[in-house]
């Protein structure tokens, strides 16, 4: 049964109640992104840090009171040309030394009593300074980000499948409950290992919150409003990014910032009590043939939208009786999983292509942001420039995608991203700093647009019965791209050039792949696997509709006045009317004994006439 044309309009369409539910679905996006981007502040390395002086490495005749603070540091810590005091080494003097001139042979050793740090991007302490993750322990910083992204990958895959089995609401409530509890537990971490495991687990649950709210939001909209609803949720994410630096300055310590970021998740637990602010998706209920639940859901939506499901004679029976006649009384729920994509041709191809484009969109951003770091080492310059380009990407999608189509704008974003990357790769040493900055900003803008549009496009073209699992696979590929930057940092950026070459090549290759995608602009969401398989890519070049029209060979079916929809509606209404005892009128018919034959009946009529 077609939900978009036969069910959705009769429940009020994108009415008042649908709008209210969509508004409440934006708040989880803010809470999730607040916890996601706080990871940037947890792992940023201070610009200034050095070893703490160790008196045990100094000779017994040394008196610190005879030296100034800077002189004391110069005697105990090596000075590196161009970078100031050494980050990881100390001077060790002979025990009986009395001459502290540079001619004295001094041994360089690793730090022994810890480090002294400057202020960390608004925070006084973070994950790095809490456990001294510098020098030989630097590798634990990218490892933390890899663990966090691994949690998101597992969450997208597992909870995406769970979203198709349990429903959008149940998956959301399960994820929000566990993510809030894990967020509180992260504040109490007492070691690096505990912090890594808790962040991995919380990332998995945050992925479930984001995925379930994203899908539920789009399934409650009609085609003209889907894009704007999705992009407004993106602005909520941007607002969370803009708010984080101020929160970091106010909180000062990372456990306090983590607690503040967890508060919105705790507030979302109120969705347990208020089922009306985040109801189950009626589209998913109908697609999985949960007839009793979908009837209650449709009645709730129609009532809150101010529309009654009414028949010409009996209220509330036209749409519901059509559902009964379409599915039958003994219909059992039927659930699907992403494993069924093995039997499809179009759906898995679309899923693979959009996973590839999202992987490129997130992975190639590291190449552009690294050029920004080369232009300015200021943390806030790169951070706010990234936020501004994200906002511009949202605005670009809002203004262009509904006019030129999803596929066309995705293709344009991939082309500009690839060109920017190739120009930076080939001409960086020949370009001035301003041109490098412009190309990096343009590439960052369109790579973010590529990532946003890939996720939105995937949610539109995947069928309802496997939308959670398929979108989870696509978003998981995006997290793999985000984790690729940490892999480069784990190798001390030794493979950056190869990383840039690979992603630039992938961006060019994605241009060809995008041509194979269908167009979903102003089209209903597919519900079944059959609907997903029926999607076809539009022709690359426009052609006349009657170009291949041969009238003599055209076999048109004879016109008929028969309409199966009207007939089924008439049959269902008649059946309902005949089963009622209190009919609106009764037809008076003469009583006739069933035992009388036709001849006896004719004789009785002649006697009456005589």
Which residue stretches match the model-derived regions?
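Flexible cytoplasmic loops linking transmembrane helices in multi-pass membrane transporters
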Residues: 2-18, 76-139, 304-370, 374, ...
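Helix-breaking motifs and short loop linkers at transmembrane-helix boundaries and internal kinks
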Residues: 167, 188-193, 251, 427-430
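Hydrophobic core of transmembrane alpha-helices in multi-pass small-molecule transporters
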Residues: 123-124, 129-134, 194-207, 266, ...
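Central mid-sequence intracellular linker of multi-pass
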Residues: 46-108, 112, 228, 250-326, ...
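Cytoplasmic helix-loop-helix junction between adjacent transmembrane helices
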Residues: 131, 198-234
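Structural signature of the two symmetry-related core transmembrane helices
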Residues: 170-184, 193, 235, 409-424
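C-terminal transmembrane bundle
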Residues: 33, 37, 199, 234, ...
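Hydrophobic alpha-helical transmembrane and interfacial-helix anchor sites in secondary transporters
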Residues: 46, 162, 247, 400, ...
């Amino acid at each position: 049964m077609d939900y978009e044309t036969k069910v959705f309009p009769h429940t009020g369409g994108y009415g008042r109640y649908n709008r209210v539910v969509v508004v409440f679905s934006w708040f989880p996006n803010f809470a999730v992104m607040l916890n996601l981007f706080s990871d940037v502040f947890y792992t940023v390395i201070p610009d200034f840090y050095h070893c703490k002086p160790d008196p045990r490495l100094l000779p017994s005749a040394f008196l610190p009171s005879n030296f100034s603070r800077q002189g004391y540091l110069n005697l105990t810590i090596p000075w590196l040309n161009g970078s100031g005091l050494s980050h990881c080494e100390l001077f060790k003097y002979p025990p009986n030394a009395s001459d502290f001139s540079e001619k004295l042979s001094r041994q360089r050793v690793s730090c022994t009593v810890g480090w002294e740090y400057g202020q960390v991007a608004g925070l006084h302490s973070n994950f790095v300074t809490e456990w001294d993750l510098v020098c030989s322990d630097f590798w634990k910083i990218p490892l933390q980000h890899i663990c966090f992204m691994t949690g998101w990958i597992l969450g997208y895959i597992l909870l995406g499948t769970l979203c198709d089995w349990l429903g959008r609401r149940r998956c959301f409530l399960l994820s929000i409950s566990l993510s809030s509890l894990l967020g509180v537990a992260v504040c109490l971490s007492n070691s690096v290992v505990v912090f890594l495991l808790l962040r991995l687990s919380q990332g998995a649950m945050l992925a479930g919150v984001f995925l379930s709210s994203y899908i539920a939001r789009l399934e409650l909209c009609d085609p003209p409003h889907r894009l704007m609803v999705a992009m407004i949720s993106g602005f909520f994410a941007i607002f969370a990014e803009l708010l984080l630096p101020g929160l970091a300055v106010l909180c000062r310590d990372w456990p306090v910032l983590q607690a503040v970021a967890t508060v919105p998740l705790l507030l979302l637990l109120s969705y347990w009590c208020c089922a009306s602010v985040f109801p189950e998706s009626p589209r998913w209920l109908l697609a999985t043939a949960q007839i009793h639940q979908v009837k209650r859901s449709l009645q709730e939506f129609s009532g809150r939208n101010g529309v009654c499901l009414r028949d010409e004679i009996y209220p509330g029976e036209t749409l519901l009786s059509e559902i009964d006649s379409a599915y039958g009384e003994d219909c059992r729920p039927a659930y699907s999983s992403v494993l069924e994509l093995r039997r499809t041709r179009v759906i898995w191809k679309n899923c693979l292509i959009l996973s590839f484009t999202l992987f490129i969109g997130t992975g190639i951003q590291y190449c552009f942001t690294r050029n920004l770091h080369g232009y300015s080492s200021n943390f806030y310059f790169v951070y706010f420039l990234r936020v501004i380009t994200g906002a511009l990407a949202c605005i670009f999608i809002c203004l262009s995608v509904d006019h030129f189509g999803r596929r066309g704008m995705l293709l344009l974003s991939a082309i500009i991203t690839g060109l920017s990357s190739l120009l930076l790769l080939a001409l960086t040493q020949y370009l001035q700093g301003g041109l490098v900055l412009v190309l990096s900003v343009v590439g960052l803008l369109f790579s973010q647009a590529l990532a946003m549009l890939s996720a939105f496009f995937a949610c539109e073209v995947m069928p309802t019965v496997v939308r959670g699992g398929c979108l989870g696979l696509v978003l998981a590929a995006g997290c793999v791209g985000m984790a690729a930057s940490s892999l480069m940092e784990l190798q001390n950026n030794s493979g950056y050039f190869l990383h840039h070459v690979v992603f630039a090549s992938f961006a060019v290759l994605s241009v060809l792949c995008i041509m194979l995608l269908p167009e979903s602009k102003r089209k209903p969401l597919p519900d079944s696997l059959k609907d997903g398989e029926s999607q076809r890519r539009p022709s690359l070049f426009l052609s006349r509709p009657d170009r291949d029209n041969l009238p003599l060979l055209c076999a048109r079916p004879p016109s008929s006045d028969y309409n199966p929809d009207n007939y089924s509606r008439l049959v269902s209404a008649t059946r309902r009317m005949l089963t009622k005892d209190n009919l609106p009128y009764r037809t008076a018919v003469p009583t006739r004994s069933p035992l009388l034959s036709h001849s006896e009946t004719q004789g009785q009529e002649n006697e009456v006439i005589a």
